[in-house]
Amino acid sequence: MSIHSASPITRRKSRKIWVGNVPVGGDAPIAVQSMTNTETCDVAATVAQIRRLEDAGADIVRVSVPDMDAAEAFGKIKQQVNVPLVADIHFDYRIALRVAELGVDCLRINPGNIGREDRVKAVVDAARERNIPIRIGVNAGSLEKDLQKKYGEPTPEALLESAMRHVDHLDKLDFQNFKVSVKASDVFMAVAAYRLLARQIEQPLHLGITEAGGLRSGTVKSAVGLGMLLAEGIGDTIRISLAADPVEEIKVGFDILKSLHLRSRGINFIACPSCSRQNFDVVKTMNELEGRLEDLLVPMDVAVIGCVVNGPGEAKEAHVGLTGGTPNLVYIDGKPSQKLTNDNLVDELERLIRQKAAEKAEADASLIARG
């Protein structure tokens, strides 16, 4: 299959809901989201971080709202950003009611800790009145006490039962504008729980491996777990949970979707790990290009291969390809274009990539305009 091919994955059929102006589920692209890690009451810091996430491509951003002071701050934050905001609510249902008044785009609640059914109903009524979707967020670390007693420990079945308990509650209230997550820090538990849930409901699924770890370990866990589910067509929106800069969550999320041909944003680099055959410093070249070209949003493939063993083959499949040699050879759209020496290699390659990106953006826009 060509690297330019559409994804062979058939996605699970699900209802479409709207988080602000972002569709989730149905035939919508898989949305990538993150969560702020600033103090919500520090409005300036939170707004600054959300804007960085917007610049990185976040479709949706979640903000923790632990108390009423944070709820008031949330209202101020909402006025200063463009990306849809989800309010993360625990324990006090009145916080959900307040942020609903302040224009929240989605409410993330864990019905297990919101309290009595009348409180859940109050939240649902507020959401219905303003057409605000709800995310039922079930987590292995906060299962209801009766389920902990029944199962002895978190299991996929326990996560499913918790989720279905709350789905049934919303069904009884005739509320269908919701999505569901069943997260665990263990990859196999999370994957099994999502598979079970996908068979039970038609609502969109929010995927995540919770508390996955630091940048490296969390990326690996999330790529494995979410990759398994996404390859099966399961999942409508994703959040990569990392103990790192939230911007990294967006980058990793798009990289996972890129690798499965589910969604493209920016450059998809194909690069060799390098060996003694390399005719230029592949690692240094890649590091410099990735840093310099982060601002490019046009989906395109760039191959950086150090020698002629695999270089020509990979370069011919990319929009822009570099093959090491004496001198090095650049391919544009699969055809040899020009030779480059190692002098100013990165500068010249960056120039050619940006030139191709501009041409591709213009061609893509023209194609869309023609319908």
Curated annotation (Swiss-Prot):
One Pfam family here: GcpE
Known EC number: 1.17.7.3
Binding site for [4Fe-4S] cluster: 272, 275, 307, 314
Domain of life: Bacteria
Gene Ontology molecular-function annotations: 4 iron, 4 sulfur cluster binding; 4-hydroxy-3-methylbut-2-en-1-yl diphosphate synthase activity (ferredoxin); 4-hydroxy-3-methylbut-2-enyl-diphosphate synthase activity (flavodoxin); iron ion binding
Pathway annotation: Isoprenoid biosynthesis; isopentenyl diphosphate biosynthesis via DXP pathway; isopentenyl diphosphate from 1-deoxy-D-xylulose 5-phosphate: step 5/6
Membrane-spanning intervals of the chain: none
Keywords of this entry: 4Fe-4S, Iron, Iron-sulfur, Isoprene biosynthesis, Metal-binding, Oxidoreductase
SUPFAM superfamilies assigned: Dihydropteroate synthetase-like, Nitrite and sulphite reductase 4Fe-4S domain-like
GO biological process annotation, one example: terpenoid biosynthetic process
Cofactor: [4Fe-4S] cluster
Cystine connections: none
Gene3D superfamilies, sorted: Dihydropteroate synthase-like, Sulfite Reductase Hemoprotein, domain 1
Keyword flag Mitochondrion: no
Cofactor note: Binds 1 [4Fe-4S] cluster.
Family stated for the protein in its record: Belongs to the IspG family.
Matches recorded under PANTHER family: 4-HYDROXY-3-METHYLBUT-2-EN-1-YL DIPHOSPHATE SYNTHASE (PTHR30454), 4-HYDROXY-3-METHYLBUT-2-EN-1-YL DIPHOSPHATE SYNTHASE (FERREDOXIN), CHLOROPLASTIC (PTHR30454:SF0)
Record-given protein name: 4-hydroxy-3-methylbut-2-en-1-yl diphosphate synthase (flavodoxin)
Protein source organism: Pseudomonas paraeruginosa (strain DSM 24068 / PA7)
Gene from which the chain derives: ispG
